[in-house]
Amino acid sequence: MNIKKAIERVPGGMMVVPLVIGAVINTFAPQALEIGGFTTALFKNGAAPLIGAFLLCMGAGISVKAAPQALLQGGTITLTKLLVAIGIGLGVEHLFGAEGIFGLSGVAIIAAMSNSNGGLYAALVGEFGNERDVGAISILSLNDGPFFTMIALGAAGMANIPIMALVAVLVPLVVGMILGNLDPHMRDFLTKGGPLLIPFFAFALGAGINLEMLLQGGLAGILLGVLTTFVGGFFNIRADRLVGGTGIAGAAASSTAGNAVATPLAIAQADPSLAEVAAAAAPLIAASVITTAILTPVLTSWVAKKQARQASLEKNA
């Protein structure tokens, strides 16, 4: 029985399959993951420490020379996501009012499209990308929260730049970079461990998803996810390539962060007049989180295969 080969037939399978299994268990038998001990620590609450270990391992593969390019890619993709989200969201708000179109409000669009799932990004660039793509997460982590969304809605005065959150993401990467650049043997040792961690933190991420939210969000929520991955992804990929990337990082960032579901609450607290719209946006964003967790690996895998074919043709030309 070749389980590994079967999983790898699915685009981004080492990320997607464990994530879906975790979500299914959390939806239908959540108590199975809450028995305590090592089981709960690993399968339910393990995402953050496992991603931290993953970033350290992958950071070991980043050379000091590659760091500026990684920062450029991360900054460009982050800015592109923000501008595209603002453009589409405020366009819908202007043309169709606060209620939006097809059930999609400007608040929901901006909150979903201006965020990205850091864990999903890390897994995908770890599998398909290069050291610069991995390093870009240090900047991309800035869009993992309500800050940019609130800027877009004119409520920037109610938010602060999460500097310590950025530092917290950087520390494992920097520790890995230091070890990898000081000792080539440590680089080889650590970088081999990165891919091993992907299915474990993918399962833990899935264990935080309840598939009932997909039903609550309905077709509008699924449409929001499609918009985030494919329309937003088109611009992210172009922006990534514009600054010398392969497009893989841009594709991998075309998702909605899990904590984006809490963004409408932050918006409602900043502007109580948006409370009703914000409440309606939450299930839509939750549906987008689930939809993009499935679609973004498909897009990233397609971009990676296309890039590999082009590289092969150029090599043989």
From Swiss-Prot:
> Gene encoding it?
kdgT1
Membership in a protein family: Belongs to the KdgT transporter family.
Q: Where are the transmembrane segments?
A: 10-30, 47-67, 82-102, 106-126, 134-154, 159-179, 195-215, 217-237, 248-268, 279-299
Membrane topology annotation: Multi-pass membrane protein
List locations, semicolon-separated.
Cell inner membrane
- Please give the name of this protein: 2-keto-3-deoxygluconate permease 1
- Gene Ontology MF annotations: 2-keto-3-deoxygluconate:proton symporter activity
**Organism lineage string:** Bacteria, Pseudomonadati, Pseudomonadota, Gammaproteobacteria, Enterobacterales
This chain's function reads: Catalyzes the proton-dependent uptake of 2-keto-3-deoxygluconate (KDG) into the cell.
